[in-house]
Amino acid sequence: MGAQPPTNSRSPANGRGAVSGSILKTESLSIHFGGLAALSQVNFQALGGEIRAIIGPNGAGKSTFFNCLTGVLRPTSGRIIFDGQEITGLRSNAISQKGIARSYQITNILPNATVFENVRIAAQSRRHSWNMVAHHNALADINQKAEMALNAVGLLGKAREYASNLSHGEQRNLEIGIALATEPKLLCLDEPTAGMSQAETEETKQLVRRIAKNLTILIVEHDMQVVMELCHRITVLHYGAILAEGTPEEIQNNPKVLEVYLKT
């Protein structure tokens, strides 16, 4: 994560509305790889409508936590409750159907497909069944959802371009558009500003603020300025366990957090 402790230059989550009740909860969530506890007894709760950061040094368990939430990994023990239903151990496609979507640390798009095709494939994945009578209406609905997702991330004007022709920042935002096309209630963003220029980072922060009006967002992010400016609350992981939770102001003044960051 680097040696810089969390700092704050502005109030967090500028322009954000109020949060609501719990949409995601984990109870004693643990996962072991041999004798290594990648996550240990993680009790976590995210509220509807909030932007929530998961931070910590490299190897703290951040990506493992996302992998458990999205069905990439099956927890060794514990429970995951999403929108009132237990989803522990479900496969990724089933969790996506429940309303959880994810972007990845490494850009995960189809470079030889158009921008529109990338998003349309994701929109189509939400269809449970097909029949000849409904086929035409279903296609129109899928296309409309794809256009809405592209409009949300500012890429509708580049819908017919090949994804490989987009800038790095645009490709990262396309991945967010792909996630939005699945109509999630919870969006997990893994390093959304990684490798971006300052201008691209600012555009992505504005994008996250816009889309957060309609869903809950969890962010794993190494750029502490991004975290402090965007998020309502922050959870700090260290060696697979929760070290601290709180507002940006509380986290940046937490002695335990400062000690961990200054030692990395």
Stretches found by the model and what they are:
Residues G2, P12-T264:
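Glycine-rich phosphate-binding loops of nucleotide-dependent enzymes
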Residues P5:
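Cationic, low-complexity basic patches in intrinsically disordered or flexible, solvent-exposed regions
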